[in-house]
């Protein structure tokens, strides 16, 4: 009888139900979609190779192995969806909404430039999660036009989302 108990406990994961209770069902679905985007090889675990591939797809081709290892080491073990959700839950406890949104964008900006490519942001917003319409994209670019190099200042977008107006320069 004991092996069944141990097996069930291992499969269920201690405390895993707690992390799911921290989020609304819609938030869990959004995190699942983000996890699926990052899990490039679809094996249910985010690896260094998955991170390298997703960053390369965003134009970040020169990410060092040490940087990838540091990202992976933030977890206590293999990063499955429950661990991924737990990591976000821990980071979001008591966090300022603007910081939370900026942190989400920073995942797409490993070099810390404060901006991301317009084409990449548009692709994400029109193909993932709650897809933006052409009209919504037009309105976004009217409100937050990219610079001459095609970069979008995501920190300004985050400020407006959380404060409702642009910062005074």
Swiss-Prot record:
User: Among the record's GO biological process terms, what is one?
Assistant: skeletal muscle tissue development
Q: Which residues form the EF-hand domain?
A: 26-61, 96-131, 132-167
Q: Which CDD domains match?
A: EFh (cd00051)
Q: Which residues, renumbered to this chain, carry the PTM Phosphoserine?
A: 21
Does the record's keyword annotation contain Electron transport? Answer: no
Q: One Pfam annotation, family name?
A: EF-hand_6
Under the heading Gene3D superfamilies, the entry gives:
EF-hand
Residues that bind Ca(2+): 39, 41, 43, 50
Going by the UniProt record, its keywords in alphabetical order are:
Calcium, Metal-binding, Motor protein, Muscle protein, Myosin, Phosphoprotein, Repeat
Question: What's a single GO MF annotation on this record?
Answer: calcium ion binding
Phenotype when inactivated? Reduced trunk contractile force and complete pectoral fin paralysis. Muscle weakness is most pronounced in an appendicular muscle and is explained by reduced myosin activity and fiber degeneration.
For this protein, the record's InterPro entries field holds: EF-hand-dom_pair, EF_Hand_1_Ca_BS, EF_hand_dom, Myosin_RLC
Q: Which GO terms describe its cellular component?
A: cytoplasm; myosin complex
State the function annotated in the UniProt record: Myosin regulatory subunit that plays a role to maintain muscle integrity during early development. Plays a role in muscle contraction.
- Relate the assembly described in the record: Myosin is a hexamer of 2 heavy chains and 4 light chains. Interacts with nanos3; the interaction negatively regulates mylpfa phosphorylation.
Q: How is this protein named in the record?
A: Myosin regulatory light chain 2, skeletal muscle isoform A
Q: Which organism is it from?
A: Danio rerio (Zebrafish)
């Amino acid at each position: 009888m004991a092996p069944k108990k141990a097996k069930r406990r291992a499969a269920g994961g201690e405390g895993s139900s707690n992390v799911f209770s921290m989020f609304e069902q819609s938030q869990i679905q959004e995190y699942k979609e983000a996890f699926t985007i990052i899990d490039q090889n679809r094996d249910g675990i985010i690896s260094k190779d998955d991170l390298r591939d997703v960053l390369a797809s965003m134009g970040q081709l020169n990410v060092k192995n040490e940087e990838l290892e540091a990202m992976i080491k933030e977890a206590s073990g293999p990063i499955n969806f429950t661990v991924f959700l737990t990591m976000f839950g821990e980071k979001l406890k008591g966090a300022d909404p603007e910081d939370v949104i900026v942190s989400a964008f920073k995942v797409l900006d490993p070099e810390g430039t404060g901006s991301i490519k317009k084409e990449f942001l548009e692709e994400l917003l029109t193909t993932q999660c709650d897809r933006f319409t052409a009209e919504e994209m037009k309105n976004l670019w009217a409100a937050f036009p990219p610079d001459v190099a095609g970069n979008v200042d995501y920190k300004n977008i985050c400020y407006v989302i959380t404060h409702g107006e642009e910062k005074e320069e």
